[in-house]
């Protein structure tokens, strides 16, 4: 009977707490917010520790999209603009003429 009493007195039969209850808060804060770092590292890399601001990210994505669209527009205008040039004929009149290659 002493073996039965020793097993119940050791606490194995009842509910047990997990041994790493102190490490549990590290799992609750995802990312680098829960990691212990120096204040210098946090000052140099603040974007790793602050919560993302979704309206600011949406505004930045919109601005980047507008810039890329404008660059595409300028590229299209430049290509169509290079195909024509102003030529002067023997009478002195000017007209627009399509560029031709000397190799054709």
From Swiss-Prot:
Location in the cell reads: Membrane
Give the keywords, sorted. Membrane, Transmembrane, Transmembrane helix
Chief place of localization: membrane
InterPro entries recorded? UPF0708 (IPR026686)
What is the protein name given in its UniProt record? Answer: Small integral membrane protein 8
**Family of this protein:** Belongs to the SMIM8 family.
| Source species | Danio rerio (Zebrafish)
Primary gene name: smim8
Q: Where is this region: Disordered?
A: 1-31
Q: Which Pfam families match?
A: DUF4500 (PF14937)
Q: Which PANTHER family match?
A: SMALL INTEGRAL MEMBRANE PROTEIN 8 (PTHR14274:SF1)
Q: Where is the composition biased (Low complexity)?
A: 1-11
Highest taxon in the source lineage? Eukaryota
Transmembrane intervals = 55-77
Taken from the UniProt entry, a GO cellular component term is: membrane
**Topology of the protein relative to the lipid bilayer:** Single-pass membrane protein
């Amino acid at each position: 009977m002493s073996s039965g009493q020793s097993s119940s007195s050791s606490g194995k039969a009842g509910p047990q707490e997990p041994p790493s209850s102190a490490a549990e808060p590290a799992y609750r804060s995802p990312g680098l917010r829960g990691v212990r770092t120096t204040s210098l590292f946090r000052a140099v890399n603040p974007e790793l520790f602050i919560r993302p601001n979704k309206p600011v990210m949406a505004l930045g994505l919109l601005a980047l999209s507008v810039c890329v669209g404008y660059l595409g527009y300028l590229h299209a205008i430049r290509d169509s603009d290079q195909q024509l040039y102003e030529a002067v004929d023997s009478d002195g009149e000017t007209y627009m003429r399509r560029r031709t290659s000397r190799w054709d």
